[in-house]
Amino acid sequence: MQLLAHIVMIFLSVLALVPFWLLIAASFSDSNYAVAEGYRFIPKVFSLDAYQYILQQWNQIGRAYLVTLTVTAVGTVSSILIVSLLSYGLSQKDLPGRRVIFGLILFTMLFSGGIVPQYMIYNNYLHLKNTIWGLIVPNLLLNGFTVVLVRNYFQQSIPPELSEAMEIDGAGPFYIFFRLVMPLSTPILATVGLMEAVTYWNDWNNGYVYLSKRRDLYGIQTLLNVLNQNIQALAQQDFDMN
């Protein structure tokens, strides 16, 4: 039985590596055949054109990585701080209107405002267009699910007696939050941080929407989409000519 389990796990592990191998094989394939025939386990025509193109564009790619790392770091830390502060307030039973506020957060999970209203707010009122903040601010409170997770964790995992004892000793709400609540909430905050970091790292749409005149602020995902479109267009043009 254990041998069968090992065989199944080995098979699944090899299966999980297949997409990575296909990407590596495609990177060494001639662009014309890659566009025409798709992915192959072994390149039909070997070529280093893709890597030569990357080396030629290395300054732009390196800058895009730096922008993405900066946006991911600032956005993740800011998201954790905002979500945890909001969730901590909503977890307090004596907060006036907490049910209404929490209901509005749940409402945003069910109904989206759409791209056009968001664009009008961030462009016309916050003036984030063509700035690096256009890559950070739109995702700060985009996911109400994280607020629900952290709020429930605060209510279920942190005994109110601890904060009450600190209040008796004269501690204020912010002191209690940063000295008691945050250290005890490392597991859920790490989970939320990972989710937010992946969101910021994989985001490419905000670059298209808010950086129409500042391509030097493109993140790596937006830049890769642009490069991929250019490569596919050139490859298709060469294939049609041949």
Where are these regions (language model features)?
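A hydrophobic, multi-pass inner-membrane permease signature
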Residues: 1-242
